[in-house]
Amino acid sequence: MPGRSDLVYLDSSALVRLFVPDPGALALQRFLAPRARRVSALLLRTEALRAATRAGLSPPRMALVRALLDGISLIPADAALGDEAGVLRPPELRSLDSLHLATALSLGPRLAAFVTYDERLADAARWYGLPVTSPS
């Protein structure tokens, strides 16, 4: 059914919980299991691989991270999205978080959930009316 809310947006604070030991990972896995359409900004790929590198993951675990990323539709930023991200409120929102937020906002009513564990980003997303969740 076109236009129905079926997309789940993941920011890096959510995805990292799936490959770095975290007590909330199981709740997130359960939340995501029935939801096949996962999306994020293209910058998620870099953020996730940097986090995995900082965590010192082994090559097999790095392959798992890449497999997780391959299961997410990544949306590239263009100049218009960059401009939109640059003026989002609040002014204290960090640049990469504003890119995540602008990308999620671009999905409109198709967005079923915006998954983040970053409180500042969650607050901003709620202010814009996004359906924020942090399964725990």
Whereabouts are the PLM-identified features?
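Acidic catalytic patch
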Residues: 70-91, 98-102
